[in-house]
Amino acid sequence: MKKAVVLLSGGLDSTTVLYLAKSQGYEVYAMSFDYGQRHKKEIQCARDVASGTGAADFVLVTTNMNAWGGSALTDNSIKVPEFNEESEKIPVTYVPARNMIFLSYAASYAETIGAYDIFIGVSEVDYSGYVDCRHEFIDSMEKTINLGTVCAVEHKKYIKIHAPFLYKTKSEEIKIGMDLGVKYEKTWTCYNGEEFACGICDSCRLRLEAFKEAGYKDPIKYKGEK
C-alpha cells in the first residue's frame, strides 16, 4: 500500500483531505503541529480524527512560532478580527511562512518513511487571503522539495504535493466530505479555543456559509445556540 503524509490540523479542510487520501487507497500518516497557536483544541481534534480513521501514525511536531509572533494566532496581543473586518488585505490571522514550514517537516517525514505523497488542505478559492494557499506556492514547494531530498535527486523517487481542494469552494469540499462519511462534528475551525465556536471570526463565518451553501447544517455547536 502506498504511504502518504497528511498535514492534519483538526479542521474541516485537512480532515476532509485525510478521508479523501484514505479513499484513494493510501496508508495515511498524519502530521500535526503545536506551533504556539492561540489554543490547543484543534490538536486534540486532529488526534481524535487520526485515531478514528485508523491512521497508521500520528506525529505531533512542536515548533514555537509564538517566540516571534507576527499573527493573531501566535500573539495574544493581536486581536482576532471578526468576519470582513479586514476584507481588503491579508488578515492578521496569517501566520508568516506557516505552510512553508509545515510542508518542510512533512517532506522530511515522508522521505524518512518512504512516502512519496503529501496531502494538504489548502484552497485558493474560498480562503482568507493567505499567500501560502496559492497554486504558485504549492508548485514551487514541490519543486524545492525534490531538489533537496535524496529520494528525488539520487533515486528519482519524487515527492508529490496533493492539494485536491485547491480549486474547489468550501461548499464543494463539504459535499465531497459528506459522501466520504467525514465526521465534521469532530473537527474544529474557530480561531478561539473556547467550549463552543464563536461564530463571528473569519474562519467560523466561512465554515457556516459553506455548510449552508452545501445544504447541510454544521454539526458543531456555536456560542449562543440553543
From Swiss-Prot:
SUPFAM superfamilies in UniProt: Adenine nucleotide alpha hydrolases-like
Protein name: 7-cyano-7-deazaguanine synthase
Gene: queC
EC number, as in UniProt: 6.3.4.20
Pathway terms, separated by semicolons: Purine metabolism; 7-cyano-7-deazaguanine biosynthesis
CDD domains: QueC-like
Database matches in HAMAP family: QueC
Catalytic activity: 7-carboxy-7-deazaguanine + NH4(+) + ATP = 7-cyano-7-deazaguanine + ADP + phosphate + H2O + H(+)
GO terms (BP aspect): queuosine biosynthetic process
Residue sites binding Zn(2+) per the record: C190, C198, C201, C204
InterPro entries for the chain: QueC (IPR018317), Rossmann-like_a/b/a_fold (IPR014729)
Alphabetic keyword roster: ATP-binding, Ligase, Metal-binding, Nucleotide-binding, Queuosine biosynthesis, Zinc
Amino acids binding ATP: L8, S9, G10, G11, L12, D13, S14, T15, T16, V17, L18
